[in-house]
Design a protein with these regions (language model features):
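Active-site SXXK
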Residues: 90-114, 127, 269
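Bacterial N-terminal signal peptides
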Residues: 12-22
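Structured C-terminal helix/loop/strand segments within mature extracytoplasmic catalytic/sensor domains
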Residues: 28-53, 189, 199-303
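Bacterial N-terminal signal peptides that target proteins for export
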Residues: 2-14
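A short, well-structured edge-of-sheet supersecondary motif
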Residues: 48-86, 261
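Acidic helix-start/capping segments at beta-turn-to-alpha-helix junctions
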Residues: 67-75, 118-133, 141-145, 167-169, ...
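Short, well-structured active-site flanking segments
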Residues: 107-125, 211-214
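Mid-domain, small-residue-enriched loop/turn segments at the edges of structured enzyme/sensor domains
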Residues: 139-206
């Protein structure tokens, strides 16, 4: 049976549109059965997030775009609930984008271009848990600087996408050397948006970064954080909370990101702040957010 001319024109037009703008296809359909976080807004959670930040005296910081926060309930992976303030605001994020180097390394490992031997595993773990700049630079160069940026911007990941104001970017070694490629939208050397970082954790948890076995390896490196500040410090009163995270700080820029698990409940939280007190802000934010995301009987402080 022949397709009617009008239908053929529509189909060919859509195909051309998605060919020219591949990220539009990803936006419309997602990469598979999981929904887009940008299409998973939860109005109740949004009101709770805004009220929480206001109660902490952070409303002005949000208004002035000095604070970005994204919270995603992924207890049901098929139905994420999203709330964010300045979620697409791209800020300097210091060491947080080392998660992008982690991804780049695991993509290379999955493709057989890099071996996950004991030295590589230790290097990646040190880069994440204690934020080693030396190991981050070592792994960045092993992956390849432009290769990493290509991975972040690829049709598979879209972790840096101009259509959503950027995202994760690593355009400089973690050391004194000059930037080799600043991000094209904001001229940042190490940047992130809260929503794109949240997507990183959602993609990881749903097995869409790399295969299951390597996803488990990646997640283990994000676990057992070696630096007790920001979100980790704020969750110290909740011993049942397991946290998988990467943070960053430099001068007045403070960032943290985490996948938090308590019982059967899981949520992602990302905070990016530009203020000398930003680290303290993040420690204060996580407590009421945790109690919002986890039922009271589970979140209660153990005695």
């Amino acid at each position: 049976n022949k397709m009617p001319n009008c239908l053929r024109l529509i189909v060919s037009g859509l195909s051309a549109l998605f060919f020219l703008f591949p990220s539009l296809a990803a936006w419309a359909y997602g990469t598979d059965e999981y929904p887009s976080l940008w299409e998973s807004d939860d109005s109740r959670l949004q009101k709770q997030l805004v009220a929480t930040l206001s109660s902490l005296g952070l409303g002005k910081a949000v208004q002035n775009k000095k604070l970005s926060v994204a919270v995603v309930d992924i207890t049901d992976l098929d139905r994420p609930r999203v709330a964010a303030v300045n979620g697409n605001q791209m800020l300097y994020a210091a060491s947080l984008p080392k998660i992008a180097i982690l991804l780049g390394a695991f993509v290379e490992i999955e493709e057989g271009s890099m071996a996950l031997d004991s030295r590589t595993r230790e290097s990646l773990t040190q880069m994440i848990r204690v934020s080693s700049n030396q190991e981050a630079t070592r792994m960045l160069n092993r992956v390849g600087k432009e290769r990493l940026l290509g991975i972040l911007q690829s049709d598979k990941f879209h972790l840096y996408d101009p259509e959503v104001n950027g995202g994760l970017w690593v355009g400089k070694e973690y050391g004194k050397s000059a930037a080799f490629h600043r991000d094209p939208l904001h001229n940042l050397s190490h940047g992130a948006t809260a929503m794109q970082v949240a997507r990183f954790y959602y993609l990881l948890e749903t097995g869409r970064l790399v295969g299951d076995n390597l996803s488990t390896e990646m997640k283990s490196m994000l676990g057992n954080p070696g630096i007790n500040h920001k979100f980790v410090k704020g969750l110290a009163d909740y011993p049942d909370a397991k946290i998988y995270r990467k943070s960053g700080s430099w001068r007045q820029w403070h960032a943290d990101s985490a996948l938090v698990e308590t019982g059967d409940h899981k949520y992602i939280i990302v905070g990016l702040a530009e203020d000398v007190n930003g680290g303290a802000w993040l420690s204060h934010i996580i407590k009421p957010i945790h109690e919002l995301m986890v039922p009271t009987k589970l979140a209660a402080v153990s005695h």
